[in-house]
Amino acid sequence: MIKFNTKLLFLSFLLLISLRPLQSAEMVDPIKVDWSFKGLTGTFDRASLQRGFQVYKEVCASCHSMQYLSYRNLGEPGGPEFSEQEVKAIAASFEIEDGPDSQGEMFTRPGKPSDKFKSPYPNTQAATAANGGAYPPDMSVLVKARKGG
């Protein structure tokens, strides 16, 4: 004859009931959204990209470089799409070290759209020293470092 342990049966029942919400949470499908940037012909929201550049310029640029991008990239289709005059003004707001001149000296000049984004640090060692031993990643290749980027 089989004896039933009521306490064990009751605890087993409670365990099954407590696992039920976990099972139902796994079965929920994510909401499907039609993103504007989905697919080969997708586009990004221009105003959103311009705000993103503003955030980079005001916050991120104090530590992070974008050494693989030129100022002219800000005016390209699919990017922030600033006008040619805006790109020139953005580039000119930076002092770029150039040269050497005819005397062999380096000099500074206003930036041009063809210039690469100015780095906040002169070299890797200065960037590492200014950030407690950690080198801030370059923001121009950050997307490629992410899954699906």
Language-model regions, residue ranges each:
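Post-cleavage N-terminal segment of exported redox proteins
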Residues: 2-43
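Electrostatic cytochrome c docking/interface patches
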Residues: 29-54, 65-84
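Short, contiguous pre-domain boundary segments
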Residues: 30-40, 115-124, 129, 140
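C-type cytochrome heme c attachment motif
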Residues: 54-66, 118-122, 135-144
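Active-site-surrounding "flap" and adjacent substrate/cofactor-binding loops of secreted or lumenal enzymes
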Residues: 76-104
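N-terminal secretory signal peptides
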Residues: 101-109, 113-115
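Thiol/selenol-based redox catalytic cores and closely related redox-interacting motifs
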Residues: 109, 113, 123-149
